[in-house]
Structure formats: C-alpha cells, structure tokens
From Swiss-Prot:
The gene is xseB. Gene3D superfamilies: Exonuclease VII, small subunit (1.10.287.1040). One of its GO terms (biological process) is DNA catabolic process. Belongs to the XseB family. Keywords: Cytoplasm, Exonuclease, Hydrolase, Nuclease. It catalyses: Exonucleolytic cleavage in either 5'- to 3'- or 3'- to 5'-direction to yield nucleoside 5'-phosphates. It is an enzyme of class 3 (hydrolase). One of its GO terms (cellular component) is exodeoxyribonuclease VII complex. It is found in: Cytoplasm. This is Exodeoxyribonuclease 7 small subunit. Its EC number is 3.1.11.6.
C-alpha cells in the first residue's frame, strides 16, 4: 500500500490500527527496509501508537462499574476508576 493509499490514522478502528502497528514492528525487526522507508514507517507507527492510546483511554472512560448493595443486588453504576 502506498502512502497515498494508506488511510488516515485518525480514521482507523483500534483493531486496524493495532494490526498495522504490528505489521510495522515486524518489518522493522526484519531489518530489510531501507533507511528512509524505516524512518517513514517508524513515524507512522508512532502515530498509530498514539491513536491506539487515545482510543483505549476513551474506552476506559466509558466503562462503568456496577455497585452492589449489602445484599449483593445491583444498585447503580459508577466510573470504573471510582472518580
């Protein structure tokens, strides 16, 4: 896939971003990529990593913990981190 054909990082789902990031890591670990291309795909990898971190953070903020009363029955929800 050429650079112009690669989708914008911000438009990728978490799963697609992780898959592309894993592909980049594999290519860099093989060591058979030219220096200029290595730098280019490394920079895309950094952008993918940041995008994944942002998506994970947003997902964590949406997760809620169920509160139970003394009898163990659901009473409501609260943020997972207790905030």
């Amino acid at each position: 896939m050429t650079d112009s054909a690669k989708p914008e990082v911000s438009g990728l789902s978490f799963e697609k971003a992780v898959a592309e990031l894993e592909s980049i890591v594999a290519r860099l670990e093989r060591g058979d990529v030219a220096l200029d291309e290595s730098i280019e795909i490394y920079e895309r990898g950094e952008a993918l990593k940041k995008h994944c971190e942002t998506l994970l953070s947003a997902a964590e903020n949406r997760i809620e913990k169920i509160r139970l009363d003394r009898a163990g029955k659901p009473q409501g929800v609260e943020p997972l981190d207790g905030a």
